[in-house]
Amino acid sequence: MQLGTGLLLAAVLSLQLAAAEAIWCHQCTGFGGCSHGSRCLRDSTHCVTTATRVLSNTEDLPLVTKMCHIGCPDIPSLGLGPYVSIACCQTSLCNHD
């Protein structure tokens, strides 16, 4: 009985430690895409990718911004305008191209 209790306690502690670790996301900005993985702050829960069409850009490549965020933001809260798409995910380095 004590062995089962000990195993249960070990499993709970390992889950708590995993939850306390920070997520990793690509954090960068570039036309057409970018990648630069780095650790987020502990309270970040999502990796976010935004793509903004810049009308003056002659190559018609979107300006891609990748970041860590608390939750998945809605487009108006980012203040990026009408030509924006957004994608969110919740696993480390999931916001790759």
From Swiss-Prot:
Cellular compartments annotated: Secreted
Stated induction or repression of this protein's expression: Up-regulation by IL22/interleukin-22 is suppressed by IFNG/Interferon gamma (at protein level).
Positions of the UPAR/Ly6 domain: 25-95
This protein's GO CC annotations: extracellular space; plasma membrane; synapse
One GO biological process term: regulation of neurotransmitter receptor activity
UniProt keyword terms in alphabetical order: Disulfide bond, Secreted, Signal
Lineage: superkingdom: Eukaryota
InterPro entries recorded: Ly-6/neurotoxin-like_GPI-ap, LY6_UPA_recep-like, Snake_toxin-like_sf
GO molecular function: acetylcholine receptor binding; acetylcholine receptor inhibitor activity; acetylcholine receptor regulator activity
Signal peptide boundaries: 1-22
Disulfide bonds: C25-C47, C28-C34, C40-C68, C72-C88, C89-C94
UniProt main location, coarse: secreted
Tissue and organ distribution: Expressed at highest levels in cervix and esophagus, followed by adult and fetal skin. Expressed at lower levels in brain, lung, stomach, small intestine, colon, rectum, uterus, and thymus. Not detected in spleen nor bone marrow. Up-regulated 3-fold in psoriatic lesional skin. In the epidermis, predominantly produced by keratinocytes of the suprabasal epidermal compartment (at protein level). In attached gingiva, produced at highest levels by basal cells located in the lowermost epithelial layers (at protein level). Detected in serum (at protein level).
CDD domains (alphabetical): TFP_LU_ECD_SLURP2
Assembly and binders: Interacts with CHRNA3, CHRNA4, CHRNA5, CHRNA7, CHRNB2 and CHRNB4. Interacts with CHRM1 and CHRM3 probably in an allosteric manner.
Function statement: Binds and may modulate the functional properties of nicotinic and muscarinic acetylcholine receptors. May regulate keratinocytes proliferation, differentiation and apoptosis. In vitro moderately inhibits ACh-evoked currents of alpha-3:beta-2-containing nAChRs and strongly these of alpha-4:beta-2-containing nAChRs, modulates alpha-7-containing nAChRs, and inhibits nicotine-induced signaling probably implicating alpha-3:beta-4-containing nAChRs. Proposed to act on alpha-3:beta-2 and alpha-7 nAChRs in an orthosteric, and on mAChRs, such as CHRM1 and CHRM3, in an allosteric manner.
Protein name: Secreted Ly-6/uPAR domain-containing protein 2
Gene: SLURP2
